[in-house]
Amino acid sequence: MPKLKTKSGAKKRFKVTATGKVMSAQRGKRHGMIKRTKKQIRQLRGTRAIFKTDGDNIKKYFLPNA
């Protein structure tokens, strides 16, 4: 059976760390920023770890070779 291909959209959105955690950018920074405080906008920078169960599903179905 051939290897599963990695989904190219997931390749751009998720990174798997050396310990196996799945990291992703924070949500909520595309539009509607005028109603957020400067502190809220600042705290949305960077990446966050995804919950373990969601991360396991991402690794299994979208990033099988990671």
Swiss-Prot record:
Record Pfam families: Ribosomal_L35p
A cellular-component GO term for this protein: cytosolic large ribosomal subunit
Stretches the record annotates as Disordered: 22-41
MF GO annotations: structural constituent of ribosome
Coiled coil: none
Compositional bias segments (type: Basic residues): 27-41
Keywords annotated in UniProt: Ribonucleoprotein, Ribosomal protein
Biological process (GO), any one: translation
InterPro entries, alphabetized: Ribosomal_bL35, Ribosomal_bL35-like, Ribosomal_bL35_CS, Ribosomal_bL35_sf
PROSITE patterns in alphabetical order: RIBOSOMAL_L35 (PS00936)
Record family assignment: Belongs to the bacterial ribosomal protein bL35 family.
PANTHER family to which the protein is assigned, alphabetical: 54S RIBOSOMAL PROTEIN BL35M (PTHR33343), LARGE RIBOSOMAL SUBUNIT PROTEIN BL35M (PTHR33343:SF1)
Name of the protein in its database record: Large ribosomal subunit protein bL35
UniProt organism field: Rhodopseudomonas palustris (strain ATCC BAA-98 / CGA009)
Taxonomic lineage: Bacteria, Pseudomonadati, Pseudomonadota, Alphaproteobacteria, Hyphomicrobiales
